């Protein structure tokens, strides 16, 4: 059980709170879990609007969009953000700071520079050196060294950290509320020979095009197959590039609620994750497993690891639509084998439940707080001020 000694915990989310994403979900779920356990939690995050923010979230200002790791990240950086970060730290009286993705230009990096004392950094990114954009290296290393402890959400994220910054981390996976998905209801409209996909489907690295390229071969074996796509995006633009004879079997659902997602994952014949890269964990895979879904995913390192190298789900060669089609056909042809693997995956998914994951994170917090220090403001550094474009009187 998590210790009942109440702590004041500051968590920094680097990405815009209003934009759906794995890091935002992780931070929000962790904050709510810690609050329910009796701790005082404040989350600092960029936000497009102060309206409808949870009570525990403090806006650091409006984010801007930058390309990052094959996607668009909405982050906040610069002298005004630095001042807001310092103010939040000075008012927080925190026992520990938990900074997510402190190695990219964001408020997490600013908080790492601005604070002294117990600080834990969680690293989510997984990418090859040439594909990832970390902050300016001369400023990074001394900042990252200030972290008392480091967490990576997967072995893939840990390897990225070791490769880029030559430092190590404890692996603690992302968490899910497994019971929410375990109790999903089977809905006939999504069941049968159906393929499910959830994500920002117009983002190339999410891989929807690979699933659609596999579809003709799948249809030739299973003429009744239907594809259901949930998530934000322009469905009309996507339908335009799909063969006309296939369009009537592809259904775009738009955004769905958490309850609908649990039912969707419970119901679909196969859940397909054809992502091409840039994934360090795969929360949606853990949620799908917890729902009892039969998962087919690309063999990128994070997905392959999460699926136990094929024990809890099926992998196909990344970006190979023909291999994906073969795997789908084989699974639809052998329902008993498919369901047996899904049953194992559902049991395994309990290891990602917040009851387990939050306990591990709090163990890291305790290690960071072992010296008894509180979080305080560091003195402003003139070279950092110069980097931010502030007046240094030089």
Question: What is each PLM-predicted segment?
Answer:
Residues 187-206, 212-216, 228:
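Conserved donor-binding/catalytic core segment of Leloir-type glycosyltransferases
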Residues 239-262:
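Nucleotide-activated donor-binding/catalytic signature segment of Leloir-type glycosyltransferases, i.e.
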Residues 294-297:
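Short hydrophobic beta-strand element within catalytic cores of glycosyltransferases
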Residues 309-321, 330-336:
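Conserved acidic donor-binding segment of nucleotide-sugar-dependent glycosyltransferases
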Residues 323, 330, 337-351, 363, ...:
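A short, well-ordered alpha-helix in the C-terminal region of glycosyltransferases
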């Amino acid at each position: 059980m998590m210790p009942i000694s109440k702590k004041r915990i500051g968590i920094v989310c680097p990405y815009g709170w209003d934009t759906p994403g794995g890091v935002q979900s992780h931070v929000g779920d962790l904050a709510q879990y810690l609050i329910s356990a009796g701790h005082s939690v404040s989350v600092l995050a960029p936000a497009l609007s102060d309206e409808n923010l949870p009570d525990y979230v403090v806006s650091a200002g409006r984010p801007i969009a930058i390309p990052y790791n094959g996607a668009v990240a909405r982050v906040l950086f610069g002298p005004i953000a630095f001042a807001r970060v310092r103010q939040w730290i000075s008012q927080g009286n925190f026992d520990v700071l938990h900074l997510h993705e402190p190695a990219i230009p964001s408020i997490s990096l600013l908080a790492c520079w601005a604070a002294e004392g117990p600080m834990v950094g969680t690293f989510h990114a997984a990418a090859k050196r040439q594909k990832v954009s970390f902050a300016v290296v001369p400023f990074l290393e001394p900042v990252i060294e200030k972290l008392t402890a480091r967490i990576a959400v997967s072995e893939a994220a840990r390897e990225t950290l070791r490769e880029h910054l030559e430092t190590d981390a404890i692996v603690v996976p992302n968490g899910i509320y497994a019971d929410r998905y375990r109790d999903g209801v089977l809905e006939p409209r999504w069941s049968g020979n159906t393929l499910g996909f959830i994500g920002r489907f117009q983002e190339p690295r999410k891989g929807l095009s690979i699933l659609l390229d596999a579809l003709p071969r799948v249809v030739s074996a299973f003429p009744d197959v239907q594809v259901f796509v949930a998530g934000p995006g322009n469905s009309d633009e996507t339908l335009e590039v799909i063969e006309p004879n296939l369009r009537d079997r592809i259904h775009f659902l738009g955004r769905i609620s958490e309850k609908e997602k649990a039912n969707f994952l419970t119901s679909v014949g196969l859940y397909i994750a054809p992502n091409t890269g840039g994934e360090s964990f795969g929360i949606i895979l853990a949620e799908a497993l917890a729902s009892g879904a039969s998962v087919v995913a690309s063999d990128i390192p994070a997905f392959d690891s999460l699926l136990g190298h094929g024990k809890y789900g099926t992998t196909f060669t990344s970006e190979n639509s023909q291999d994906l089609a073969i795997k789908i056909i084989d699974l639809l042809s052998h329902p008993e084998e498919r369901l047996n693997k899904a049953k194992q995956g559902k049991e395994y998914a309990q290891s990602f439940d917040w009851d387990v994951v939050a306990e591990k994170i709090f163990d890291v917090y305790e290690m960071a707080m072992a010296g008894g220090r509180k979080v305080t403001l560091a003195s402003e550094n003139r070279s950092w001020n110069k980097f931010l474009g502030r007046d240094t009187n030089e």
